[in-house]
Every structure is written in structure tokens, then in C-alpha cells.
Amino acid sequence: MVLDPRDSLLSSYDYPLDPERIAQLPVEPRHAARLLIVQPLGMKPPIARHAEVWDWQEELRAGDLLVINDTRVLKARLRVRRSGGGLAELLVLEPRGEGRWLCLGRPAKRLRPGDQLWLEALGEEPIALQVISKDSASGGRVVQFPSHYANAEQLELLLERYGEVPLPPYIKCHDPSDSERYQTRYASRPGAVAAPTAGLHLSDELLEALKQRGVMLTSVTLHVGLGTFRPVETEDLRHLQLHSEWVEVRDEVVAAVMACRARAGRVIAVGTTSVRALEGAALAGGGFLQSFCGPVDLVIQPGYRFAVVDGLLTNFHLPKSSLLLLVSAMVGRERLLALYAEAIEHHYRFFSYGDAMWIDPGAVLPAARPC
């Protein structure tokens, strides 16, 4: 594939967006969100059709395989009191051993190594935390928790008691229902600090309708972390590196994909995290999907040929984000920006609680399709 030099520049993935287009609340029911359907290549204009997510079932076929991400968002945002006075926030990301956890802090400049922090709840003894060091790779802080919160299961109990679901900063409206509404209906494996948002559109009713049509379902796990939501700062994308995220692709997923291929079905990823999980597992297998459990730091951008994924249901992503690069790898950068302009013109809602886009396998660039 011959790339336009601009495809390797981060600044080429910018687009203007009125803040009013950023969804602050989810629609109800889930499947009532709008759906931009990307026309297959070779079709006459327009480049897209407009529908609702409920109508997506009409685009799928019996024998197709949907791959969902079953991660569950932790209540990973902690509000703490600093020993010198004032409040701060911690977003707990990943373990660093011996009760230490990597956290993003706010305000970061006031969280210095050696600082004491206090986690408080009404009627309970405060829990003492301590900032151990700065983490240069992430810009975060390594924080010491009490030793009995050394593993993920123990920490989850603490987060459930003291924490909040960490909504993205562009969502200004917070509601108690967010703790469930910012989860997919099938979220079952705790570990993420952000939701796999394309899956938020799949209601129980839509999942049942797809099942009745003969569409198959399998689930991978990718615990959404720093690699998904951290801003890209590398202008020359040939040197881009992403923070790794924990992935599990089980034997039954591999079997489901093989069975799908055998019946001439299509492998459809629900969300970019499902793409990253499948393609990361295939990369570990030398280009062939195999079961996998471990970190994935795969960068998908224009020029990438997919090994597993044929089509994609996805949300509208932030300018200059790694997710925008991934979707551009499927449909081409200029075409994707034209599709985003179409969505903006028709008043689609953007980002986590926003509307969706359906990329049919026929809309994927031929050079990017699985062999």
C-alpha cells in the first residue's frame, strides 16, 4: 500500500468540532442512538446513509460473528485529602507490586513524592496513602496503598467502597446512574478505567434480535487503560508508541473465528478495543489468531493490513487520537474525515455517550482487508 506522507502526521487527523456536539448523556433506549452507515466502496454518492443502531441488524447476516469486549469499568476515581490541605483526585491504573499502584493524579503538580494522602468516608477511619514517585512514561504517580490492598481483587473492594466511575473529562453531567449506564450490558470482567463505548449501544433487545437472525457472539477481554485514552503527542506517527493494555483472547474465541471463516461469515468487531485485542493476539501468533493472555501495545494506523477483523461498529473519536488512526487504517484518512464532516453536518453526537458508525466489510480499503 502506497501511503500519502500526510497519513504519518498527527496534525492530519485533526478536525473542528463544536463542543455542543459532545454527548453529555446517553440516549434511552441504548439502541436508539443514531448510526452512520458507511457505503461500500464503488457505490455512488452519498458516502453514507443515516439510520439508528436498532437498524444495524439489517446490515448483518446469519453466520456473522460479533466480537464484544466483556471488560467492566472499575470505580477507579478516588477523591483524596492532601495532608497539607486541599483535595486531589487519583485515577488508579495498574499494579506496580507490593501494594503500589500507578495512578494519574489531579492536580498532578501538587502530588509530590513523599506526600501523604487520606482516603475518607463518613463514619470510617481514614485510609493513609503515600506518593512514592513520579512515573516519567505516563506522567502519573506511583502511590503506596496499605499492604492488604496489594492485589486486584482486594483493591476492587476498596474502589467499590470509596471510588467513582471515571467518566471522561469532556462529560460534565454526572449522575448516579452512570455507574451502570457507563457499562455495557455484558460487562463481566472488572479491570477497565474507561468503557468500550461502542458496546454501550447494544441493548438486551438488540442482542436478542441479532441472535434470532443467526448472528453469533463471542467475547474477548481488553481492560481499557492508558493506551486507549491518553492523548497522542508524537507528530511523526512512524515513531508512535502506545501504553500497553491487558488482553485475553480465549480458546473459544479462536474456535468461533475459525468456525465463522468455515461458513463464509464475517468477523465484526464491536469497538476498537475488540479490534486491538484480536489483532494483538494475531500478531503474537505470527499473523494467525491464537489464544493469548498478556499486554498488547499494538499501533494500528494507515498502512496496516488486518489479520482477523472484517468490519467494525464504532463511536466517533477525539481528534488526533490513536482510535482515529485505527479507523483510518480501515477506510482511509481523507475518507474518514469526510465521514466525520458528514456526521457533524447532520448533528450526530460525538464521543463516549454519542452516536455510532458502521463500517461494512465492503467499505474497508482492499489493501487493509484480511488475506
UniProtKB/Swiss-Prot annotation:
<dbReference type="GO" id="GO:0005737">
    <property type="term" value="C:cytoplasm"/>
</dbReference>
<protein>
    <recommendedName>
        <fullName>S-adenosylmethionine:tRNA ribosyltransferase-isomerase</fullName>
        <ecNumber>2.4.99.17</ecNumber>
    </recommendedName>
</protein>
<keyword id="KW-0808">Transferase</keyword>
<keyword id="KW-0963">Cytoplasm</keyword>
<keyword id="KW-0949">S-adenosyl-L-methionine</keyword>
<dbReference type="GO" id="GO:0008616">
    <property type="term" value="P:queuosine biosynthetic process"/>
</dbReference>
<dbReference type="GO" id="GO:0051075">
    <property type="term" value="F:S-adenosylmethionine:tRNA ribosyltransferase-isomerase activity"/>
</dbReference>
<dbReference type="InterPro" id="IPR036100">
    <property type="entry name" value="QueA_sf"/>
</dbReference>
<comment type="subunit">
    <text>Monomer.</text>
</comment>
<dbReference type="Pfam" id="PF02547">
    <property type="entry name" value="Queuosine_synth"/>
</dbReference>
<keyword id="KW-0671">Queuosine biosynthesis</keyword>
<comment type="pathway">
    <text>tRNA modification; tRNA-queuosine biosynthesis.</text>
</comment>
<dbReference type="InterPro" id="IPR042118">
    <property type="entry name" value="QueA_dom1"/>
</dbReference>
<dbReference type="GO" id="GO:0002099">
    <property type="term" value="P:tRNA wobble guanine modification"/>
</dbReference>
<dbReference type="InterPro" id="IPR003699">
    <property type="entry name" value="QueA"/>
</dbReference>
<comment type="similarity">
    <text>Belongs to the QueA family.</text>
</comment>
<comment type="function">
    <text>Transfers and isomerizes the ribose moiety from AdoMet to the 7-aminomethyl group of 7-deazaguanine (preQ1-tRNA) to give epoxyqueuosine (oQ-tRNA).</text>
</comment>
<dbReference type="InterPro" id="IPR042119">
    <property type="entry name" value="QueA_dom2"/>
</dbReference>
